[in-house]
Amino acid sequence: MDNDYESPWGLSQLEAPADSQNIDSQPLNDDELGINTEVQVKRTRHVAKLDDTRMMDDKGLPALKHLCTKVNLKGNGHEVGDLGRLLDMYQMWSHDLFPKGQFKSLYPLTSKAGRTATVRGLRLAWIDEEQRKKQTADVATAVDELEDITDFRDRGRHFETEPRYSRQSEPPVETSVNVDNPDDLFVGMDSVDHRLVSDEDVDIQAEVSRREDDEDREQDVSELLEGARAQRDKDNSRSSGRLSLFDLGGSGSPSESDRGGSTLEGDIFGTGSLDPTPPPASETSTQAPAAQPPATQPPQAPAPTQPPSNQAPVKAPPQPMRQMDDLELDMLADFEPDFEDQEQHEPEPDPEDYEDDEAMAVMREMGL
């Protein structure tokens, strides 16, 4: 075992060997100590904190509130698109708030900053402001509805007290009324200023007058139509017991004309205003003069003899027809016979068209 007292470091400086003193007395270079070498110090990057001051700045929550008003959310069925629009809005806001920051670090920062008392107070103030605006709008709407109901009731009371006259009634007796404003809508409204009368009252009064005129016009037209139908039924009843057109004109047999029977043309109403048509001249010349006395009969020249083989039979000229008026043509349509297959020959006219024609004829007579 070594003796500790014999070691060089265990002795004092006086007792130490000379070799150890020579080693400690040698000078050292600066390069070896590292004094002249440059030391690079890394500077820590300053990260802006999301505190209350930055959140209340113009680029903070006020800017976010302004951006929310510009976002158009479509709602049901467009959830994915609405989420993309919200993310774009928050990304723009975070870029203005932290120009060199990352969007991934936005959520933890905003979540921590939203728990402060200042931000909570600002959010509650915004909620109260929106509720007050909504309540004010509801109250204004209720007041407007109440005013409309009151105005409608006032107009209803005025219409009940105001006398109404139709075109067929007698005109009212004119009385002298003191009118303050010549522009008043109703006569007798002295206490109402003409500037307080709205355009809606004028439109209502014009609509009431127009409807009254339409009702009176329809009543006049219906009365004229009823009179025309009654006259037509009366004419049909008068002509039902008279001769029809199928028993007149060319329907008679030649024997009846030889017996001297007179035929009538167009006298289907039995008025007797039409004279019987005389027989043609060709028929009177061919009749035998046996009914006349021989003394009064003038001598007749003998007819020239012609060979019967070359002579063509003489035909009587056609009898001229008298043109019928519109009323007789309408009666002729009533006496036409009905065909069994009338639907196959021609379509049956619609009765509504016939009534429309009558209505148009009556309106032309009135000059409408």
Curated annotation (Swiss-Prot):
Keyword vocabulary terms for this entry: Cell cycle, DNA damage, DNA repair, DNA replication inhibitor, Meiosis, Nucleus
Bias kind Pro residues: ranges: 291-307
Biased composition (Polar residues): 19-28
InterPro entries: Csm3, TIPIN/Csm3/Swi3
UniProt region (Disordered), positions on chain: 1-33, 153-358
One GO molecular-function entry: DNA binding
Keyword Nucleus: yes
Alphabetized Pfam families for the sequence: Swi3 (PF07962)
Composition skew (Basic and acidic residues), residue ranges: 153-167
Subcellular location: Nucleus
Job of this protein: Forms a fork protection complex (FPC) with TOF1 and which is required for chromosome segregation during meiosis and DNA damage repair. FPC coordinates leading and lagging strand synthesis and moves with the replication fork. FPC stabilizes replication forks in a configuration that is recognized by replication checkpoint sensors.
Subunit structure: Component of the fork protection complex (FPC) consisting of TOF1 and CSM3.
Official protein name in the record: Chromosome segregation in meiosis protein 3
